[in-house]
Amino acid sequence: MDISTDNPDHGFQFPGTFELSAMGTAERGLETELPRLLAATGVELLQESVSWKHSSSGKYVSVKIGFRAQSREQFEAAHQALRDHPEVKWTL
């Protein structure tokens, strides 16, 4: 089955710049661990695009990471690495 689109401007374009967010428990050091985890998948980490915010209670932290992926496979590997982390509760 061949899947094509009538508008190639829709959807992800590769290579491209993307951002993933992950939320987990604050005391686990996810602010530094998750960017290292993404870099290990082979994507180009955009250091200036790494940010985090603690929840109002301080129990959780949300980490946003910008990166460049050369292919959908690279993007999927980066997203899977975040999902597989035992302290990550959700990704976006």
Swiss-Prot record:
Belongs to the UPF0250 family. The lineage of its organism: Bacteria, Pseudomonadati, Pseudomonadota, Gammaproteobacteria, Lysobacterales. SUPFAM superfamilies: YbeD/HP0495-like. InterPro entries: UPF0250_YbeD-like, YbeD-like_sf. Gene3D superfamilies: 3.30.70.260. NCBIfam families: PRK00907.1 (NF002066). This is UPF0250 protein XAC0666. It comes from Xanthomonas axonopodis pv. citri (strain 306). Pfam families: DUF493.
